[in-house]
């Protein structure tokens, strides 16, 4: 018998697996290897909600935990996936400058918000009122991280590449059985895949579609992350990631021309240089009505638990939530009610 079965290898799955490895727990992962939010997301780590210039839920705490966590994964996987870059928010009007100065005085923001407005010196970026600058920010190459972690598990023969069959899961006196595998616990971290599992139908998970593009723009020459309705993230070699859209109505797989038009419209308001589109990708983020993660042990089946609802802040939230769930299962540490699965009526 092993300690854990993990279903799904996105950011939440990788985070929980890494926590298990750090605590010498045995586990296997079941994952179908198809596109997930972790493979198409922007990967930004930023504790400030730029639309309102306010700290996100537990932002400083999440930042303090997430970056060392990913750094330890870099060592294990022998990769570089953490990329530091300031975020420059375009000040659309003079009133934005006052809001920015006010935000810089909030205690939870001081470590990240520069009080001084940065003047625009890039000739192809439209920012007549300058930028509000965030420091200690950047992005994680989540696609690389998930890919390399998958290879690591394959080399250790602890990855089963298959679609999880919910009907094949059996409950035993000491845990669960799935095929020939017996385990003390099974943890579901498969994002929107959880929606089709009847055992979790009481959780109001939603599929929120996001699309982004990768462009090539030789004249942009910008290393900072630019935000002005969309993010522009430098990938090197004159390539930039542009995104992302949020669509609650479109449930179809694949990219859309409407999303491309929306991204291009916003991008053309920011830059005046010629560019061409290299690729466009789409994925679904799992979200909840209150925009909070959902983690914990199933109210009826104590052998099964979940980490889900990361939304667009999975890079920051996944390591934190993985740690909370592990400590809850192994040590009985309470999970905060605002992200506890028990906030939804079973």
Predicted ranges, named:
Residues 12-19, 23, 32, 43-44, ...:
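Active-site substrate-recognition segment that forms the wall
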């Amino acid at each position: 018998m092993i300690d854990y079965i993990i279903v799904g290898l996105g950011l939440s799955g990788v985070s929980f697996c890494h926590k298990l490895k750090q605590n010498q727990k045995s586990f296997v992962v079941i994952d179908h290897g198809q596109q997930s939010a972790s493979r198409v997301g922007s990967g930004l780590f930023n504790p400030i909600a730029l639309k309102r210039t306010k700290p996100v839920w537990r932002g400083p705490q999440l930042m303090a935990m997430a970056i060392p966590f990913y750094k330890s994964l870099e060592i294990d996987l022998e990769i570089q996936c953490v990329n530091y870059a300031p975020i420059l928010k375009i000040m659309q009007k003079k009133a934005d400058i006052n809001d920015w100065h006010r935000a810089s005085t909030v205690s939870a923001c001081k470590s990240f918000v520069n009080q001084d407005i940065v003047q625009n010196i890039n000739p192809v970026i439209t920012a007549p009122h300058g930028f509000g600058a965030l420091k200690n920010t950047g992005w994680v190459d989540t696609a690389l991280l998930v890919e390399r972690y998958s290879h690591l598990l394959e080399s250790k023969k602890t990855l089963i590449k298959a679609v999880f069959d919910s009907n094949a899961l059996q409950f035993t006196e000491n845990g669960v059985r799935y095929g020939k595998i017996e385990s003390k616990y099974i943890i579901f971290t498969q994002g929107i895949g959880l929606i089709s599992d009847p055992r979790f139908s009481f959780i109001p998970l939603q599929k929120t579609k996001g699309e982004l593009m990768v462009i090539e723009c030789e004249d942009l020459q910008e290393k900072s992350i630019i935000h002005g309705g969309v993010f522009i993230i430098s990938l090197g070699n004159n390539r930039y990631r542009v995104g992302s859209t949020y669509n609650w109505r479109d449930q179809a797989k694949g990219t859309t021309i409407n999303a491309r038009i929306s991204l291009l419209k916003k991008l053309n308001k920011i830059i005046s240089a010629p560019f061409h589109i290299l690729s466009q990708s789409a994925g679904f983020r799992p979200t909840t009505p209150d925009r909070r993660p959902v983690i914990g042990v199933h109210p009826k089946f104590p052998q099964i638990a979940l980490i889900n609802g990361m939304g667009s802040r999975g890079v920051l939230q996944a390591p934190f939530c993985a740690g909370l769930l592990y400590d809850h299962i192994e040590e009985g540490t309470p999970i905060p009610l605002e992200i506890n699965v028990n906030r939804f009526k079973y």
